[in-house]
Structures are given as C-alpha cells and as structure tokens.
Regions:
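N-terminal cap/lid segment of alpha/beta-hydrolase-fold proteins
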Residues: 1-18
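Short glycine-enriched nucleophile-adjacent loop
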Residues: 109-120, 126
Length: 358
C-alpha cells in the first residue's frame, strides 16, 4: 500500500516477526515509536507521523496479525500484550534506540501499559490517544478490575460480531451492510458525521488484517456464564482479555516512571464507561438476550479504570495529564488532529528535553 506524503515504509525483520515499518522525519531525529489499535495498521498514523516537529523521527510498525506483518507469525493471547511488546523491543534494538517516547492508540495503549511495567527504562514518555483500559477489554465490573466471573466470561474473541467477521473475510470495503468495516468505523470510531479525508486508505488498511481463529479475533471458547463465551488461546481480542493482560499495578513498582499524556474524546463509544460493544451495554439495549442485569453483569468502567491506575501512578511518583477533546470520538489523533498535536507535540518536546535523546 502506498504511503502518504512525508512517510516512507520498508520491510524489516526484528526478533520473531517480519513486518512493514513506517518512518517519517530525519534519520538522526529523536525517535518516537507509535502503536495503533485493533482493526488498524501503521497507515492510521501517517498524518500524525508527517506532522511531527522537524526534530523528531516517527516510527510505526504493523503489528503481527495486521498489515504487512508475516501471516505465519501468530499472537499467543495467553501472554496478553507480551508478543507485541517483545516485537516492539526487538525493533528498538534493531534500530539501536535506547530510549523513546511511546505513542499508543486504542490497543496500542494496552501495549504501552505493558511496556511501562516491564520496560520502563526504554521510555522517555507515554502518549495515549483513546487508549484501552489497563485492565483489558470487558469482563470486569469496577475500577479495580475485579472480574465478573472466575472464567472471565464476557471477554475475549466472542466480543467480535460474527457478521463483521464475515464482511472482513469478504474484504467488503463498502457500506451496503451495517457490519462492514467502513460502517463500523463510521459508527464506533470516527463519531458521526465525521468522515476522514483518507477514509478509503484507512479502510483498505483495515482490510489487510489476518482473520481467523488464530488471528483476528481469535478462537471463541464457550462459557456457562452469560454471555456464554470466555477468552481463548489465540489472537488480538483474546489477548485483550483481563485474564491474560499484564497486571496494570505493576507500573507502580517500575524503576522508571515516564510522564503520561492521556488524550481522549468526550464522545468515545469504543473505549468508555459502558462501551458500545460491551455485552452489558448491548444487553441493556435488548440486543444481547439473557442479560442478567447491572447487578450481576455491569458494563466495564474503562475510563474510570484508566483514571484509577493513573491516580495510583501519580501517588507512586509518576505524573500524568488528562486532556478531553470536545465533540470527538475514539481517535483524537485522527479526527481532531490540531487539538491532539498541540498537546502531543508540547509533551514530546518537554519530555525529550528532560530525558535526553536516544
């Protein structure tokens, strides 16, 4: 897939995966590493990469399972974000980067939480755009991430709509069904009526993903507990289950505590206290039969969980800033780029000056 102006791409082999990596800026610039979300590739960062201040070198790889990554290399969901983190650290080593700011969108935010816990010494700052909850996606009931069921029912690959999976397999880029990727992005990600100028490129990038029981969304495992599925072994959505995700409180004991910028849209329905795809949200709307009610199966307080962990992080010696972008959906970096870049660039400059370059 061709890149946007100001961005180049090349194929690289690092660690256990061969993948496509996007670059922007001067080769001797301060490196900034980007990670994108579910249903996306590095293409989604191209405008942000190209808009970086001239002293920075933007880097964004396609994650395993997506885009230009080797389709033979799968995600072991039982490691949570572990495979993605290992791939990213291997890329840093290959590029001879000691420390870098990390930028995470959606699932890329979950990768950032894991990096903060296990590789804090590699991070100059953490910059989040609509990040996933540090407790993963669905299956928990309070800000402390308490699982609703012992088997973590309500999280994992069963969250993905089978009709969306069918359209992904068919590579349908249209809007003839409410379950095509374009329809899903318009409803859940962009925030109606917003349609990005390069929507065609973003949809094409999403359709590059590998779909199946060992890829996206992964294997679905039955559970006796409503909504009658639990996390499986493979793929990105199972990897997001709180069963597999790294304990977020591990960041409290990390030897380095990089400053965190958390930017979110005020109208985000993909990551929210009661996200649109949360089984409890769908149950309350009458769209998922058998919902036992909010006492037995409440919606996950994703934003509340993020703030809870970051407040603990601040008490443990870290710092964070929360910025809420008005009239904005799930990806402020894409749909409100001026607002996002203003705070993002300021954070980059202040934290790289304080922490030194690579």
């Amino acid at each position: 897939m061709p890149t946007n102006d100001g961005v180049t791409a090349r194929t690289m082999k690092t660690g256990g995966v061969t993948t496509r990596v996007h670059f922007s800026g001067p080769e001797d610039g301060t490196p900034v590493m980007f990670n994108q979300g579910t249903l996306t590739t590095a293409t989604w960062w191209e405008e942000t990469l190209a808009a970086l201040p001239v002293e920075f070198r933007g880097i964004s790889p396609d994650r395993r399972g997506f885009g230009g990554a080797d389709p033979a290399v799968k995600v072991d969901a039982t490691r949570g974000m572990g495979d993605y983190v290992d791939d990213l650290v291997a890329l840093l080593d290959e590029l001879d980067i000691d420390k870098t700011p990390i930028v995470g969108m959606s699932l890329g935010g979950n990768i950032a939480w894991h990096l903060m816990a296990d590789h804090s010494e590699r991070l100059l700052s953490v910059n989040l755009s609509g990040p996933g909850s540090p407790y993963g996606f669905c299956g928990t009931k309070d800000v402390e991430g308490t699982p609703i069921h012992d088997d973590f029912a309500g999280s994992g690959a069963g969250l993905s709509n089978p009709l969306l999976i069918e359209q992904l397999k068919a590579k349908n880029a249209g809007i003839d069904s409410p379950f095509t990727v374009r329809s899903a992005l318009r409803l859940l990600v962009w925030k109606p009526p917003v349609i990005p100028e390069r929507e065609d490129a973003f949809v094409a990038a999403s359709l590059e993903m590998q779909v199946g029981e060992d890829s996206y969304p992964g294997d679905v495992v039955e559970s006796p507990n409503w909504p009658h599925f639990k996390p499986g072994r493979w793929g990105s959505i199972n990897a997001l289950s709180p069963k597999h995700i790294r304990d977020p409180k591990a960041i409290l004991d990390a030897p380095n505590k990089p400053p965190v910028l958390w930017v979110r849209g005020d109208a985000d329905v993909a990551v929210a206290d009661g996200a649109a795809s949360d089984p409890a949200t769908l149950g309350a709307m009458g769209l998922k039969p058998g919902w036992p009610g909010p006492e037995e199966h409440p919606a996950q307080p994703m934003v509340g969980q993020t703030r809870y962990i970051l407040d603990l992080y601040a008490e443990a010696g870290g710092t964070y800033e929360e910025v809420v972008v008005a009239d904005c959906g799930h990806v402020p970096s894409m749909t409100k780029p001026d607002e996002f870049n203003r705070v993002f660039h300021a954070h980059l400059k202040s934290t790289t000056q304080a922490g030194g370059q690579q």
